[in-house]
């Protein structure tokens, strides 16, 4: 299909402006019918890709969707024919991105189709939430690790952020069906309880979270071969940042935040940095290495559940203590170390702590 050549929009699409109805005479703009018919070209593409269950795919036929790409009427019609596909997901910003864009498009155009699509997207998020309060990566697709509680790439925290905006009637989300407000608040409350229950206890001490947790046992679990049960120095940041947004945080939430921040502090890799270098001996002529750099601080993407030591895992699923010990393809194609918690530790947590000291 022609539309299958599309790629996922960068987060910047949220800043794109809706197309004006330039062909209409100025006098017609004030008429209610003309306002209702106003269109946003990006929103129209989102409507075409929305699945009948309310969610959106991140890709079609393994090719990612790009709402910036022009689509003809035939392309839009072809996209609509896949409405019954069961590939809706919250991975890679799918669904949460569209909902957020569409509520703003509705405010700007007053096109009721955008409001309805956003509301159906919100209902999709409510439907996909599991009894534990967790959110799977895909719904209703349960193959592989897709049904597990997914913090990976901040999928669950983004879903909860949208639902919290609905519950709080924040900004343009105040325009959606009022019946969704209490439902969204209930979902947020359940999600917070899931976050608290999945925070890993290591030798009697609360620490952080895995990128995926088993939907039944709530324990850390495996995803891809190189994503073993472990503690995440990346996704755990977004979880804590979400908890910081809660009004009147309970003592349990405050303890969880304090424990996670303490874990980030003790899990630092100090005086090291990551560097991308040219290396003619490698297959693609490049490599990614960890180098000594006084004053720099890193955190690993994965930490061993027992020892809390950084682990680096390639496609063979074997743990290694050094980035250099895994294959070049993974070293250069995946991010195993970064500075993710830096802003949380330096700015966000200290500011929050002034208002909400640890219990």
Residues covered by each model-derived region:
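Long, well-ordered core segments of solenoidal/helical folds
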Residues: 41-54, 117-134, 185-204, 256-273
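Bacterial N-terminal signal peptides that target proteins for export
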Residues: 1-7
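Eukaryote-skewed repeat-based solenoidal scaffolds used as protein-protein interaction platforms
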Residues: 115, 119-122, 126, 143-199, ...
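Solvent-exposed loop and edge beta-strand segments that line ligand/cofactor-binding
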Residues: 22, 28-35, 79-94, 143-156, ...
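Terminal, non-catalytic domain-edge segments
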Residues: 20-42, 165-190, 216-223, 227, ...
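Intrinsic, low-complexity N-terminal interaction/targeting segments
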Residues: 56-57, 61-62, 69-82, 131-142, ...
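N-terminal carbohydrate-binding/catalytic regions of secreted carbohydrate-active enzymes
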Residues: 40-96, 101
């Amino acid at each position: 299909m022609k539309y299958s050549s599309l790629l996922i929009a960068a987060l910047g699409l949220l800043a794109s402006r809706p197309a004006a109805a330039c062909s209409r005479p100025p006098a017609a703009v004030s008429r209610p019918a003309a306002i209702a018919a106003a269109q946003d070209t990006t929103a129209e593409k989102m409507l075409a890709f929305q699945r009948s269950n309310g969610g959106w795919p991140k890709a079609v036929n393994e090719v990612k969707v790009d709402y910036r790409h022009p689509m003809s009427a035939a392309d839009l019609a072809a996209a609509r024919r896949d409405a019954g596909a069961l590939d809706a997901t919250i991975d890679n910003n799918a669904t949460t991105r569209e909902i957020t864009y569409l509520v703003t498009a509705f405010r700007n155009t007053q096109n009721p189709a955008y409001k309805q699509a956003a509301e159906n997207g919100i209902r999709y998020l409510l439907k996909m939430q599991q009894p534990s309060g967790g959110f799977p990566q895909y719904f209703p697709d349960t193959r592989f690790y897709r049904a597990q509680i997914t913090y990976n790439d901040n999928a669950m925290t983004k879903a909860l952020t949208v639902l919290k905006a609905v519950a709080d009637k924040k900004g343009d989300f105040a325009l959606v069906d009022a019946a969704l407000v209490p439902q969204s608040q209930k979902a947020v409350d359940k999600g917070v309880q899931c976050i608290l229950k999945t925070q890993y206890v290591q030798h009697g001490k609360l620490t952080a979270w895995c990128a995926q947790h088993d939907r039944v046992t709530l324990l850390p679990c495996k995803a891809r071969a190189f994503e073993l049960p472990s503690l995440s120095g990346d996704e755990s940041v977004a979880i804590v940042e979400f908890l910081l947004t809660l009004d009147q945080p309970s003592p349990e939430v405050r303890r969880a935040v304090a424990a996670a921040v303490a874990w980030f502090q003790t899990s630092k890799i100090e005086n090291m940095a990551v560097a991308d270098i040219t290396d003619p001996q490698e297959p693609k002529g490049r490599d990614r290495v960890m180098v000594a750099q006084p004053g720099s601080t890193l955190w690993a993407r994965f930490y061993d559940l027992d020892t809390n030591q950084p682990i680096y895992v390639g496609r063979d699923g074997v743990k290694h203590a050094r980035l250099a010990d895994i294959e070049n393809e993974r070293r250069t194609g995946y991010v195993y170390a970064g500075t993710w918690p830096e802003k949380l530790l330096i700015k966000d947590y200290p500011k929050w702590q002034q208002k909400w000291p640890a219990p």
